[in-house]
Amino acid sequence: MAHKKAGGSTRNGRDSESKRLGVKRFGGESVLAGNIIVRQRGTKFHAGVNVGIGRDHTLFALTDGKVKFEVKGPQNRKFISIED
């Protein structure tokens, strides 16, 4: 007779890789055209002046300049712009 119960398989033990989301360039920082400013899921931050938006909602600089974060509109949305 076995003295130990047979070990069953567990259904846990998996974890996905982190996606490295978040702000990459902060307010006042100088950026070059093409620099990624924010990696995000959905539009937590919206594209302002001189900022483009990628297929995965990544915000990037369209021109050289300084990053500016601002809150505006009736919904208090966060916009990111590039100032010269």
Curated annotation (Swiss-Prot):
One GO molecular-function entry: structural constituent of ribosome
Pfam families, A to Z: Ribosomal_L27
GO biological process: translation
One GO CC annotation: cytosolic large ribosomal subunit
Alphabetical keyword list: Ribonucleoprotein, Ribosomal protein
Region described as Disordered: 1-22
Family, similarity comment: Belongs to the bacterial ribosomal protein bL27 family.
Protein name per the record: Large ribosomal subunit protein bL27
